[in-house]
Amino acid sequence: MEFTAPVSSGYTVYGKSDCSFCEKVKDLLTEFNETFLYINCDEYLIANKAAFLQFIEKLAGKEHKTFPMVFSSAKFVGGYSDTFKKLIETHAD
């Protein structure tokens, strides 16, 4: 199975069903008028969870097993809290 890579501009959010922080990060990005691609990872996790987590680890440069998994311009940001901090810093002006 091929996994969808993060987009080169804007945000990419890897999420899953029944994930409250996945919903919160989508709301947060919308509130800050940021464009984002949301990828529901339910099928990835069912088909091959280990391979998906390896894919994320390779992209992120470190292990990250919790959702959401957020990238900005294909660079790993982290989860909800990290994304919130980045948005506050970016929009501080």
Write out the residue ranges for each language-model feature:
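Local sequence-structure signature of Cys/Sec-based thiol-disulfide redox active-site neighborhoods
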Residues: 1-39
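Thioredoxin-like thiol-disulfide oxidoreductase module
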Residues: 41-65
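Non-catalytic, surface beta->alpha helical segment in thiol-disulfide oxidoreductase systems
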Residues: 72-93
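Alpha-helical interaction elements in eukaryotic regulators
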Residues: 18-21, 48, 52, 79, ...
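Structured loop/turn residues at secondary-structure junctions
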Residues: 16-17, 44, 75
